[in-house]
Every structure is written in C-alpha cells, then in structure tokens.
Design a protein with these regions (language model features):
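Hydrophobic transmembrane alpha-helices that form the pore/transport pathway of multi-pass ion
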Residues: 94-144, 269-282
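Hydrophobic transmembrane alpha-helices of multi-pass solute/ion transporters
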Residues: 4-92, 199-219, 240-242
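Structural signature of hydrophobic alpha-helical transmembrane segments
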Residues: 1-9, 54-65, 105-114, 177-180, ...
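Alpha-helical transmembrane segments and, especially, the helix-loop junctions at the ends
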Residues: 109-114, 132-163, 186, 190, ...
C-alpha cells in the first residue's frame, strides 16, 4: 500500500511540471489520481464518497455565481477603474488594488479576483515592468487572502474539510499573519512600482468570458476539489508514517516546493486532523507564501500570467525575491510568536 501511494504521490507532484498536457488538464488529472489514491490507501467507502461529493459544493457555487456577476459587471467595472485611475495617484491605486483584491478574494474567490486584476491591468496600460510587478504583488496578496475562508480557493476548502473545522477556523489560525502580509504587499507595491509612461505594456489576451467558459470552469473546480478530497484521504497512511512527527519549522521550508506545484495538491498530501494547530499553521503559511513565487504555484498566477502573457522568467525575476523575503520574515514570526 505504501509503495503504491508513494508512486501516486510522485506522479501527482511531477507530471504537471513535466507534461504540458497534464498541466493544462490539472483538474481532471487530480480527479483521477484522487480515486487512485483512495483505492490504494484502502479508504474508499460510502462516507468518503459522500464527503467528496459534498466538499466542493460551496466553492463551486461561489465560483459560478461570481463568474456570472463578473461577466455582467465587467464593462461597468472597466469604466469605474478608468475613472479611479484619473482621480487618484498611481501609488495609492497600486496599494488599493493589492490590498482590496487580497481581502476580497476570500469572498469573491481567488479566480474572480485574478480576473478583476487582469481587467485593472488592461485598463491602466502601464509599462511592462510595472504591470508585471503589480500583477506579482497582487497575486501574492490574492493567494494569501483567499485562504481565509473555505470558499476562497481549493486549498482552504480542502483544509477545512480534512481538519473538520468551522468556517472561520483559518481566519483565526492564520488571519493576523495573512492580513498583515496583504497590507505589507500593498505598501510595497506603492513604494516599489515606478511606472514609465512612454514604455510598452503587456499585451493582454483578455476577452469577455462566455457562459460556456464559466460553466466549464465551474465543473472543473468541482472535480478538482472532489479529487483533492479523495487524494487527501488516500494519503493519510503516508502522512501518519512520515509527516506527523516532523517539526513545523522543517515542514515550513519543505513547502517551498509550492512555488512549482499547486499548493492545494500539497495541502491534500500533508494536512492531517491529528496535527497540532502550530503545525497546520506552518504548513499553510509555507504553502501560501511560496505559492506566489512562480507561475505554477497558484491559480491566480496561472490565470494572470496566461491572460497577460507574462513569461515564467519575467514572473520569477520579481516573484522569487519577494517570496524568499516573505518566507524569511514569517519564519521568524512562527518561531517566536
């Protein structure tokens, strides 16, 4: 059993990184791997199936409703952004963009927050360097903020489900760290980003989403979260054998691999209800912070980079230094607070 689970874990971690077809169809791949892990781990039964069917419901509804609202309100939103851009200085606009998207992402979902970010960047028409910086800071903020509620992103949905906790558990556990990080990223965006008016900006591939695309994304999110629920249950024997006794500080740095792998997938493989709150906190903060370093680490990164045509190298130039600095700062916080 353990050997089979190790093979499945290796496939889950490596194939999305090396096989483009798997990366493009990550939700379906993880759905299949979730079934494989549950069968290999000997945990597939009616209660687990019921849980796997129920867990994705809230985030799926949130994604669908938010997608419809975004489609209907996109044009007015563009006009509002243009008016705000004319009325306030750019540093203040940059800070507000990063902070508000980060805080709202836990309600409107990380996916919709990323789509709004694409609209904002498209309207502002800054130089390429400044736009890339704004996107990276914003995606760090969105990735962190969305984890505060179980409807914000798949990682938080899965964490609440596996731990059997209430809606506001993550807000209590990592809320102070996440909210302070979101505000700090906003302040840094205001200070660091210096737009050059004459330079060439990003070429956006932004187009209005169709109802079919909204429905398709909704189905994929449902399958994604269902697969992660099965995956997390299937990996319980591995967690019990190898991770439960590890120091939370070691787990924190191990989770830097979230920079190249989807953090919800890693959360499914690592989190256990048998862990202490301090260990869960270290795991989540490590995953959330490092998830912003590179494009594959988080859903908002993938959406923004794809629609705005930001290359992996451009993202890494800004994302890696920001992420490493944030990891160091919050390691000290975890160590001494």
């Amino acid at each position: 059993m353990i050997s089979a689970l190790i093979i499945i874990l290796a496939l889950v971690l490596l194939l999305p990184f090396f096989v483009p077809f798997v990366e493009r169809n990550l939700e379906i791949f993880l759905f299949i791997m979730g079934w494989a892990a549950a069968i290999a781990g000997g945990v597939l039964d009616k209660p687990l199936l019921r849980k796997a069917l129920e867990d994705p419901v809230n985030i799926t509804i949130a994604v669908f409703v938010a997608g419809l609202l975004f489609r209907w309100l996109e044009r007015p939103l563009e006009k509002v952004i243009s008016a705000i851009n004319r009325g306030i200085p750019f540093p203040l606009l940059a800070a507000l963009t990063v902070i508000l998207l980060g805080l709202l992402s836990s309600v409107i979902t990380a996916i919709i927050a990323a789509l709004i970010l694409v609209v904002i960047v498209s309207v502002l028409r800054l130089d390429r360097k400044s736009e890339t910086q704004l996107v990276v800071y914003s995606c760090f903020s969105i990735g962190l903020g969305a984890a505060l509620t179980p409807i914000g992103e798949p990682l938080s949905t899965l964490a609440i489900s596996k731990l059997g906790e209430d809606f506001f558990y993550l807000l209590r556990l990592i809320g102070p760290e996440v909210i302070s990080a979101v505000v700090i990223f906003g302040i840094l965006a205001a200070i660091v980003i210096k737009p050059e008016q004459s330079a060439i900006g990003l070429k956006t591939a932004h187009t209005r989403e169709s109802y079919v695309e909204i429905a398709g994304r909704t189905v994929k999110i449902y399958l994604f979260v269902m697969g992660l629920t099965l995956l997390g249950a299937g990996f319980e024997p591995l967690i019990n054998r190898f991770l439960l006794d590890l120091s939370p500080f070691i787990l924190y740095w191990i989770n830097m691999i979230s920079a190249v792998l989807d953090n919800a997938t890693l959360a499914a493989a690592e989190i256990s209800p048998k862990m202490a709150d301090k260990t869960v906190q270290a795991i989540l903060l490590g995953l959330l912070i490092s998830g912003g370093m590179l494009v594959p680490g988080n859903i908002p990164n993938i959406i923004s980079a794809g629609k705005l045509r930001i290359t992996s190298r451009e993202w890494a130039r800004f994302g890696l230094p920001i992420g490493l600095a944030a990891m160091a700062v919050y390691f000290v916080v975890i160590l001494f607070v």
